[in-house]
């Protein structure tokens, strides 16, 4: 009976944890719309971190970069390499977009593990990484969709839509469906990974001593960085594909 009671209490604890993480939200009313306030708060914090870091790093640029300037130039070079590899020689105008996506997702993912969101109490719900919310990841995926449609139409005009009947008109439904599955796969992959990572850490912290979840937290940081890179790489690949033709 003691074992059964312990098991029931453990399952109840897991249910309570998952309910707090997933089901409750702090809503704001903005212009007649209901938005998730905690997502806006954490997104603003992430944006402030990015803008503040960039401002501090480049406020006094040197010919021979050092410190923060050197780090940001390395990050910029890395983003340029990713963009050039996926888009091709016309990658230049898309570096800011790909870089913004990568940095926002990277810092958002890491903020869920490194920033003490729990100390800020809300009337409902709790603060977590912005990418922990499906609304954020869907918005990022839709922005990517708009970007690759814009890239294709700018490069080819209305001839861009010819890709839907290549290599044969029979594939028209499948080619149309592909454009719907791209944002779905981008958004749910990122959302699922970040949500699962945070839930696993919370469950382990509640069940075992604090030292045990640390390796899982480090693994979560690694996978969070990989997810940011995957999202940015796929976004660049979709843009490059729309400019070059259907593959």
Swiss-Prot record:
- Spans through the membrane: 38-58, 95-115, 134-154, 199-219, 220-240
CDD domains documented for this protein = ATP-synt_Fo_a_6
What keywords sit in the KW lines?
ATP synthesis, CF(0), Chloroplast, Hydrogen ion transport, Ion transport, Membrane, Plastid, Thylakoid, Transmembrane, Transmembrane helix, Transport
For membrane topology, the record states: Multi-pass membrane protein
What are the GO MF terms of this UniProt record? proton-transporting ATP synthase activity, rotational mechanism
One Pfam entry for this protein is ATP-synt_A
Task: Indicate yes or no for the key word Membrane.
Answer: yes
Q: Where in the cell is it found?
A: Plastid, Chloroplast thylakoid membrane
Q: Name one GO cellular component term.
A: proton-transporting ATP synthase complex
Q: What's the subunit arrangement here?
A: F-type ATPases have 2 components, CF(1) - the catalytic core - and CF(0) - the membrane proton channel. CF(1) has five subunits: alpha(3), beta(3), gamma(1), delta(1), epsilon(1). CF(0) has four main subunits: a, b, b' and c.
Entry's family note: Belongs to the ATPase A chain family.
What is the role of this chain? Key component of the proton channel; it plays a direct role in the translocation of protons across the membrane.
Question: What name appears for this protein in its UniProt entry?
Answer: ATP synthase subunit a, chloroplastic
Q: What is the organism of origin for this protein? A: Panax ginseng (Korean ginseng)
Its lineage opens with: Eukaryota, Viridiplantae, Streptophyta, Embryophyta, Tracheophyta
